[in-house]
């Protein structure tokens, strides 16, 4: 089992890590320190409110501790997890992928709060994920056998603008997506 860093404070997440017998460390603001000390919870203090010239320090600290992966507990720590995991896993693309997911979800939440309809979205790692998402979206829309599918949009993470954007209506169309366009973001059509 891997050694995980929980980014942010959630007693439920700590209890879950313990119940799964996971080695973990909580990375949270200073206000969590006293509670962590009183309850023997492994803890590293960190202020997530803004990026600064010490931002690389937390990734290096966790790497030196032997942490395998950082897990964001809140939307606000997704970007941090992407940056930290890009160091821990030696994969610079993870930061960009985390930023895309965070930006997209923030944008959707703000639009929804403003009364704008938004589609559902999810990350796909392979063609099977895309087919499952297409079927799930159309089952949710109560499509009957023989009804044409509502399309979904698939967008490669590492492509800019409209490059790598595809509109998929049938499972057969998924075969046309090249392997290098994974992972990708899928979204229901409005």
Regions found by a protein language model. Give the residues of each.
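Short glycine-/acidic-enriched loop or helix-start segments at secondary-structure transitions
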Residues: 15-16, 36, 80-83, 163-165
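Short beta->alpha connector loops
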Residues: 6-12, 76, 124-128, 190
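Helix N-cap/beta->alpha junction signal
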Residues: 9-10, 29, 74, 104, ...
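Alpha-helix capping/helix-boundary segments
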Residues: 12, 32, 76-77, 173
